[in-house]
Amino acid sequence: MSVERTLSIIKPDAVAKNVIGQIIARFENAGLKVIAARLQQLSRADAERFYAVHKERPFFKDLVDFMVSGPVFVQVLEGEGAIQKNRDLMGATDPKKAAPGTIRADFADSIDANAVHGSDAAETAAVEVAFFFPEINIHSR
C-alpha cells in the first residue's frame, strides 16, 4: 500500500456542532496526518464548481445550498491507503446505513447533512486537493 493524499471536508452541520476536533482525532488515531487545513466559507460559485460532477442530479441545488449554509473545514489527509481509510472512517453516505462508530453514524443527521466529504478515488483526490490547496500550502510531515 502506498502513501496517498485525500481531501476531507467537515461540512457545515458538523462545524456547527463543534465536532471538528473529534473528527480530526479520528483521522489522526487511524494513522492519517493533516498536512494542510483551513476553515472557510464557500462561495456559491466555488460550491457549484466543486460539485459540478453532480450538476444534472436532482439534489445538486440542495447540496450547494447546504455547502454554503455555514463554514466548512477543508483538509488534506496523508497516509498509507489514505483514500480508502478516510472512506472507511466516514461510513456510508446515509448515516442511517453507516456502521456504528463511523463519523457519519456518530455525527451526521441525514443523507444531506452527513458531516463529511471525502475523495472517492486517487484521480478525484488529486483534483479535489488542488481545488482547495496549491502545492505550496501542503506540508508533508
Curated annotation (Swiss-Prot):
From its record, what is one biological process in GO terms?
UTP biosynthetic process
Q: Which cofactor does it need?
A: Mg(2+)
- Localization per Swiss-Prot or TrEMBL: Cytoplasm
Active site as annotated: H117 (pros-phosphohistidine intermediate)
Q: Which InterPro entries match?
A: NDK-like_dom (IPR034907), NDK-like_dom_sf (IPR036850), Nucleoside_diP_kinase (IPR001564)
- Database matches in NCBIfam families: PRK00668.1
This chain belongs to the protein called Nucleoside diphosphate kinase
Which species does the entry assign this protein to?
Bordetella petrii (strain ATCC BAA-461 / DSM 12804 / CCUG 43448)
